Amino acid sequence: MEKLEIAFEPMLGDDVRQHVMEGLHAFNYVATGQDEHYPANFTLRGEAGDVLGGLLGYVWGRWLHVTYLWLAEPARGGGYGSRLIGQAEAYARKRGAVGSTLETYSFQARPFYESLGYQVCGQIDDYPPGHTKFILKKALA
């Protein structure tokens, strides 16, 4: 076998990131038969086009996974977070998703997600120290 090296690369190039993701998707397809992977990214922009928030996620295996949801301070409390989630869920339903999953922390938005029908299905205590990480899910079908 050829000699292999592990390299720390804090700034991966897009080509390397894409190669790793494609390898994982191929592996997952063999194991699950699920090949369809849809990006589910939505932005909230001001009149000048500046980004005031966004939701980054994807649909795979008939589930929406919300990876990130963020709103700039001036956009919070105006219903935009709910609208971003709603748009992502509608997009996912059109692609056959039956559920949605996301993660949040005790210092972030658990009550917000619960108000939208998400339920805690797992947690990791003391991550980061003094806080809790929550895994939530919601049925979409």
Locate predicted features.
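Short hydrophobic/aromatic beta-strand element in the GNAT-like acyltransferase core
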Residues: 39-43, 54, 68, 133-135
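A conserved beta-turn-beta hairpin within the catalytic core of GNAT-like acetyltransferases
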Residues: 59-67, 76, 128-133
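Conserved N-terminal entry element of GNAT/NAT acetyltransferase domains
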Residues: 1-12
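Conserved acetyl-CoA pyrophosphate-binding loop and the N-cap/start of the following alpha-helix
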Residues: 75, 79-87
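A conserved beta-strand-loop-helix scaffold within acyl/acetyltransferase catalytic domains
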Residues: 35, 46-47, 55-64, 69
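Conserved GNAT acetyl-CoA-binding A-motif
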Residues: 92-105
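Conserved active-site tyrosine of GNAT-family acetyltransferases
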Residues: 20, 113, 118
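Conserved catalytic-core motifs of GNAT/GCN5-like acyltransferases
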Residues: 101-103, 119-135
